[in-house]
Structure formats: structure tokens, C-alpha cells
Amino acid sequence: MKSSLDFLNNFIQRDAVKKLESINNYPLIEFLNSVVKLCEPDSVYLITGSDEEKEYIRKKALESKEEIRLQTSGHTIHFDHPLDQARAREDTFILSDTKIPYVNTKPRNEGLSEMLTLLKGSMRGREMYVGFYSLGPRNSPFQILAVQVTDSPYVIHSENILYRIAFEDFSNNTKFLRFVHSKGEPDIKKRRIMIDLANNTVYSVNTTYAGNSVGLKKLALRLTIMKAVEEGWLSEHMAIVGFNGDKGIHYFTASFPSGSGKTSTSMIGNLISDDLAFIREFEGLPKAVNPEIGVFGIIQGINARDDPIIWEVLHKPGEVIFSNVLMTEDGDVYWEGSELPKPERGYNHEGRWDRESGKPASHPNARFTVPLTSFSNLDKNWDNPNGVIIDGIIFGVRDYSTLVPVVEAFSWSHGVITIGASMESARTSAVIGKSDELEFNPMAILDFMPISLSRYLRNYLNFGKRLRKSPKIFGFNYFLKDDNKFLNSKEDKKVWVSWAVKRVEETANAIYTPIGLIPFYEDLKALFKRVLGKEYGKEEYEKQFTIKLRKYLEKTERIIEIYLKFEDIPSEVINELKMQKERIVDYINKYGDSVSPFRLEKD
């Protein structure tokens, strides 16, 4: 270890080597030693938690021009390459010698060889930054440690906002996840993200978009999903929110594909997480924590009327990194959907912009990065090391034609399989590809799946069997249309949530349908009046909650066909789907291709 420390001493800032030596973590020192030799930086800067270090990173982000200071105190803006604006599915690989359905794999030795070649000498002439973080609260049974190595001040600045710095927790050879990133060169053809499950290491090069470069975000999710499946807990792409009911607060997790309502749902309750959740079982109860302490959110469409909490965060002094929005000539920002007057000209990720060009002022996947503590609706348990008990789970999709706004599952297995594992959603701008194309995306997590869905779902089902009280599971859809017009307003989600809370509290009844339990009209009418102060007509209800049996049948058959291709799929998955299909067919024989909720209520 001494020789490795002596080598690092030539690169690391004064006194940091002593700190590194004091925590006595030989694998950590060897890891840093190997990465420095691989990437060949001019110097190395460790972030161990001091205010001085955090300020140093902020200054470096500005000096490097990776960020530009804006007129509001604490606000900066970052621009990514015009072709590096979203998660790069086609350039992201799980290193595996076995092909996995729906997972982009590459043989391990081939992938490592390619990546190490790209990283060799990639930091020459630059400074390397090393951050030491905790996923989940410190001193918690949920805690997972992670190290980020990067040559991008913007990336490490983002990590400092989004994650708990936990250098001292790395003592005595504690295990940790490893993330190595180099912004490399602006050559998208050489952009690569490789996830090495065998060594709990993720490599990323020739990219700066945070979804590809900020390791502890969605890159870490691949590693924690694997860890969760091996250990029997859940690592999920879910918000954690507390909703107040007549009997107190109830915590829900909420899973939505990116850009489909997850952040907006988390803003109507007490916020713990807007994106990720670790869920473990303690004494038969499911408890959850947020691995993060910040928000990396989509900004398009955020306006003062619909999103007052986020709007306040983005306009008050405090630490905010905007990315790929428009910077105006006076140092302010503008984004599409803000409902503010569009500026005459400005600067965005493509360079100079003017209104007459007709081009959008900001990218549809433009983002903001802020600390959780900036939000006025932050829950008091946001950093509770013991987590919060989960009473409900929401699986939401962007479906324009079929799914009702809210439905409750009959049971844990019914909800996991026919709602969560059957999710199909219109693709959004958060991933590269054609928008609005309906795609299979179970639990909104397929992009991050490092293993077979069979293993993942088996763990999910087994987790529920260990619970003495499992959360109720709900399917949400905010995007149902009729004649190409949305059937709901943005604020209606507050009513669907309120009904779910009443179901948890057992203060509302429900109508039995072949696809689950739906609300009675009178209950929703009362909730619309109480929650939103507006009337809710029978015609609205009937359009929203008519069960389109034929379309549900087609969907169920599609999902069955998908899962039958998996050799090792749990029999419970196919059986649950086949039972759903039989129920739907029975209802088609009785009612036809669709059935009004009023008719079901009478029957």
C-alpha cells in the first residue's frame, strides 16, 4: 500500500494523501492507483467533504467553461454536445459473455479492451476529480458506498449536489462501487458506457450528458439492481412521496418512465425522492430510502401555474445547474413550455439562437440539477436512516388509447405482473430514438436492467411473499386521449392520488373489473370537489373509466407473448397473465369490446 500511496502523492493535493492513508482502505488506494496510471491526469483532486473542496469544484466548473455563471446567485448553465443530449442506449453495454433478452450486452473481455483503450491517456493535460459518496443515508442499513472518478468539473459538481459525501465511511477495506468517467473528446462515434458487473465498475468516455456520465445516477442503478436481486431487496426507478389522508400520512413509491409524470407526482405530496428508491424488508414491512439528496429533472413544460414548487426552486438564489436550456443575453434562462415570452435571441447547446430561426430555444430533454433541501415540500423523513414504511406503489405510463387513469391491483402478484411487469409507454425525449413510439418497459426500468427479467421478477414476487403487509399496487395513466384530446388536466393527478390514499385507509369502495379495481363515480365526484374545487361530470367519468376490453385483451396477449420467450420465466408470471386474459374474454363475451363503469356498477 505504501508504494501506491507514494505514487499517488505525486498527483493529489496537499494533505489529501494523509486522509487517504488514515481510512485504511487498501482496495480503494489500489483502484485509484490503477485509474491514475490508466488515464494519466496531470493532477488529482480528492473531494472528502470540506466546504473548501466544494467551492474549488464550483470554481473549476466555471474556469473550464463547462459551466457559465448566470445572473441569479448560485445559478449556472451547462451545455452538452448537440448529439449528446440523452441516455445513449446504443452505446451502453452490460459486459456479459451470456446474451440477455432486452439487455444490450457485449463480451466482457472485448468490452474491457475497447474501453481501456479509449480511456488510456484520456486525462492528459487535465485534472482528475475523485468523489466519495453514499447511496442512501449514512449510518444506515441501506447505505452503499461509491467512488466517482472524472475529469469533468461539471460531473463532479453534479455529484456533490446529488449525493451524500461520505469519505470517512470508506474505512477499513469497506466495499464500494466504482465509476470511471472521462469527457474525452467530442466524438460521439467513440462514446461508450460499459457496466462491468463482475467488478462493480462502470466506465464512461466521450460524453458529458449526465445520464451517461454522472455515475451514481442511472449507471449505478444497474449495479444496485444486481446487488438487490442477489440480496433479496428492491432497487427501483421510483419516486418516494408522502401523501396526507384522513388517518395521517402514507408513503408511496411511484414508477414512471422518464418524462411521464414521476417528478410532477412527487411534487403534490411530501417529497423524499423524485427518481430512485431502495426498498428493504424489516420485520415484515417494506421500508424505503432515497439513494440521492438532489434532483436531476426534466425542465421542459415546467411553468409557474402547474409546477409552483419547482418554479420557486428554479428562480430563487441557491445552487442550480441548468443544462441545455437557452441562456439569454442578460444571463437569464428560458426553456420551452415555461409560458414566458420567448426571447429574441440567446445561446443554447447548438450555439447562437434567434427566434426567427424557428428552432426550439431549448432541448426537450433539458434539465436542472438542485439539492433536495431547496424544495418547500421536503418531508421530515427525507434522510431518515431507517427509511419510511411504504403503503402503496404506483406504476404509471404514458398511454394515449387504452389504460384507465387509475386502477388498483387485486394482490401483490397481480399488481407486480399485470401492471408493473406489463408496462408499455410512449417513448419520450429522455432517450435517443423516435418519440411517442409505444414500447415495452416493465417497472420503467428496462433501460437499466443488467440481468434477465426472469431473475428480476422472481425477486420481486419473492419480496412480496416475505411481507406481512404488502403495499397496495396501483396503475396510473395521466395521458388518456379521446379524439386526440387529453381527457384529464394536469391537476387531476391529485384526485387519483387521493383515491389511492382512501383505498389504503379503507375509506373508499371500488368497482370490480377484469383488470383490477376502479373508483365509483360518486367517490371521484366528491374528491374533485374537495381536492380541486371543481365539478366532475358523469360523461367525463364514463370516458375516462370505460374499460376498453378488446384493447386490454390485445395488450395482455402482447405481454404474454413477450414473457413466453423467456425460458426461465416464473410460472406465476404466465399464470397471472393468463387469468387476466380469461377474465377479459369472459367480459367481452358478456359486454362486447368495451364496458361502461356505470354498467359494471349496476351488475
UniProtKB/Swiss-Prot annotation:
GN (gene name): pckG
Binding annotation for substrate: R87, Y209, A210, G211, S258, N365, A366, R367
InterPro entries: PEP_carboxykinase_C (IPR013035), PEP_carboxykinase_GTP (IPR008209), PEP_carboxykinase_GTP_C (IPR035077), PEP_carboxykinase_GTP_N (IPR035078), PEP_carboxykinase_N (IPR008210)
Cofactor field: Mn(2+)
Entry keyword set: Cytoplasm, Decarboxylase, Gluconeogenesis, GTP-binding, Lyase, Manganese, Metal-binding, Nucleotide-binding
This protein's pathway: Carbohydrate biosynthesis; gluconeogenesis
Recorded family membership: Belongs to the phosphoenolpyruvate carboxykinase [GTP] family.
Principal cellular location given in the protein's record: cytoplasm
This enzyme's EC code(s): 4.1.1.32
A GO molecular-function descriptor: manganese ion binding
Active site: S260
Binding site for GTP: G259, S260, G261, K262, T263, S264, R367, R398
Protein name as annotated: Phosphoenolpyruvate carboxykinase [GTP]
Superkingdom classification of source: Archaea
Protein species of origin: Saccharolobus solfataricus (strain ATCC 35092 / DSM 1617 / JCM 11322 / P2)
Keyword Nucleotidyltransferase: no
Segments forming a coiled coil: none
